[in-house]
UniProtKB/Swiss-Prot annotation:
Family annotation (Pfam families): LacI, Peripla_BP_1
CDD domains, alphabetized: HTH_LacI, PBP1_PurR
SUPFAM superfamilies for the chain: lambda repressor-like DNA-binding domains, Periplasmic binding protein-like I
HAMAP family from the UniProt entry: HTH_type_PurR (MF_01277)
One GO MF term attached to the UniProt entry: transcription cis-regulatory region binding
Organism: Actinobacillus pleuropneumoniae serotype 5b (strain L20)
Top-level taxon of the source organism: Bacteria
Residue span, HTH lacI-type domain: 2-56
Protein name: HTH-type transcriptional repressor PurR
């Protein structure tokens, strides 16, 4: 197996020059650089990733901790992050918590041992103790979406409160006064903020919030299906339902369809996230748009910026994205 000394000898340069060419740590004349790369190719030399990381203090790797990569919302973000990592010459370690808080500790320990250059966090389960452990390593972290505030981490906020308000306001503007909710767990920041936006819009319109129309679950189609069936057992029903994710909306629409009830003529449905498949629902889903690819790319760019600069001079920043209403055909206008 060829060594760096073999490459240096064939190229007629020092091993230090070979190292600078490979790691791009110093300017090397074009002819010299070409001679080095020709020697590398001829000898089929593959530098040790571990040795290179120790030499230049980087592993060219990023860790990403998320709730689950199976959900369409997360999957679209992961795809954008992974593609951008590839374009920037980084590899990605993807860690799923599956809503299990204890998993984050193991993931953090693993990422520290892997000597990742930085970490993206997109889950609500991490604890203050976990953050303090990680902050002690000086590894940069960007908290995406609904994570807890931290003095050492950058944050990207999606303004779920604003999105909840927009969704409810749209239903009200279309003449709906009896509005229900199928949410995720309201103890979670994401659901709590969307619910608070819902409450604000309802209170501004002087509309009552009926607790028997408020259902909690998770962000899966099965939850939307189950909670819609529970709702349909009531004597008095709302004319519209605000589902806290498009996947919840899919389950809710399916439950109505199984009973021969159509959307939106029988009941209007509005979703949240604008996942790729939502436009292909039957009917196409009116929803709240979040730019998943933009969120992922922005988070990674901030992290890469932090990796490259002096950590003692960096001030953590907070970036906000604002949701938008996407009009399709799942909300009936009762004003007509």
């Amino acid at each position: 197996m060829a060594t760096i000394k073999d490459v240096a000898k064939l190229a007629g340069v020092s091993t230090t020059t070979v190292s600078h060419v490979i790691n791009k740590t110093r300017f090397v004349a074009e002819d010299t650089s070409k001679a080095v790369w020709d020697a590398i190719q001829q000898l089929n030399y593959s530098p040790s990733a571990v040795a290179r990381s120790l030499k230049v203090n980087t592993t060219k790797s990023i860790g990403m901790i998320i709730t689950t990569s199976e959900a369409p919302y997360f999957a679209e973000i992961v795809l954008a992050v992974e593609e951008h990592c590839y374009q920037q010459g980084y590899s990605l370690f993807l860690c799923n918590t599956q809503n299990e808080p204890e998993k984050i500790q193991n993931h953090l320990d693993m990422l520290i041992k892997k000597r990742v250059d930085g970490v993206l966090v997109m889950c609500s389960e991490y604890t203050r103790d976990s953050l303090e452990l990680f902050n002690g390593t000086n590894i940069p972290m960007v908290v995406m979406d609904w994570g807890k505030a931290d003095d050492h981490s950058d944050r990207i906020l999606d303004n779920s409160f604003e999105g909840g308000y927009l969704a409810t306001q749209h239903l009200i503007e279309n003449g709906h006064k009896d509005i229900g909710v199928i949410a995720g767990h309201l103890s979670k920041t994401l659901s709590k903020e969307r619910y608070e936006g819902f409450l604000k819009a309802m209170h501004e319109a002087n509309l009552p919030v009926r607790q028997e129309w408020i259902y909690e679950g998770d962000f899966e189609p099965e939850s939307g299906f189950e909670q819609m069936n529970n709702l349909l057992r009531l004597e008095k029903l709302p004319t519209a339902i605000f589902c806290f994710s498009d996947t919840i909306a899919l389950g809710a629409i399916s439950a109505l369809s199984e009973k021969g009830l159509s959307v939106p003529s029988y009941m209007s449905i509005i979703g949240y996230d604008n996942i790729h498949s939502s436009r292909f629902y039957s009917p196409p889903l009116t929803t709240i748009h979040q730019s998943k690819s933009r969120l992922g790319v922005k988070a990674l760019n901030i992290l890469l910026e932090r990796i490259k600069i002096d950590k003692t001079q960096y001030q953590p920043q907070t970036i906000e994205f604002h949701p938008e209403l996407v009009l399709r055909r799942s909300v009936r206008n009762l004003n007509k």
